[in-house]
Design a protein with these regions (language model features):
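Bacterial N-terminal signal peptides that target proteins for export
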Residues: 2-13
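N-terminal signal peptide c-region/cleavage motif recognized by signal peptidases
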Residues: 22-24
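Terminal leader/tail segments of proteins
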Residues: 26-171
Length: 171
């Protein structure tokens, strides 16, 4: 094959490869669809409603270690990004080594207002994506961190066992 014929072929090949990568990343950044609700719960401290939580899975049931899972939190009050990150780090204490928490977490947890929704989607491959009001924020590929993050709400020894039971559809 002459050099003149190879260049157009390589250009077309590169264009197709880039298009495939672009479509894959676009598909992964779309808000998850087709999941069934497992359970829901309201999280309150004293008399303050903080958020409503809903958990979704492929078939509407929760089985530890299985994915995909989608956790949606709809907030009832304003909370700064810094407060969300700090509380997340506090809740991860004992579940995940603080030094190993991905630095991107600071960029992925936005400030929220009353009515805002923050969602975390754990894919079957262990990657986790964050969404804010349905808009893709970014993802973390650390499957150990992603599981520990969901365990804040789903672990048998979570700080709020009633919330955990309801999210798992047990009440």
């Amino acid at each position: 094959m002459s050099a003149c014929r190879v260049k157009p072929f390589l250009s077309v090949y590169l264009l197709v490869a880039l298009l495939c990568v672009s479509l894959t990343s676009t598909a992964q950044s779309r808000y998850p669809q087709g999941l069934e609700q497992v359970g829901q719960a309201r999280f309150s401290l004293l008399w303050l409603d903080i958020y409503d939580a809903r958990l979704f899975s492929a078939d509407g049931s929760y089985r530890p270690g299985e994915a995909p899972l989608l956790l949606e939190l709809t907030y009832h009050r304003a909370i700064s990004s810094r407060e969300l990150v700090d509380e997340t780090l506090n809740q991860l204490e004992g579940r995940f080594e603080r030094a190993a928490v991905p630095g991107e977490l600071n960029d992925l947890l936005p400030s929220v207002d009353d009515g805002d929704q923050l969602a975390f989607y754990l894919r079957a491959d262990g990657a986790g994506a964050f969404y804010f009001n349905g808009k893709y924020l970014g993802e973390l590929d650390d499957s150990d961190f992603n599981r520990a993050f969901l365990d804040i709400w789903l672990a048998p020894d979570s700080e709020y066992p009633e919330l955990t039971r309801r999210l798992k559809g047990k009440e």
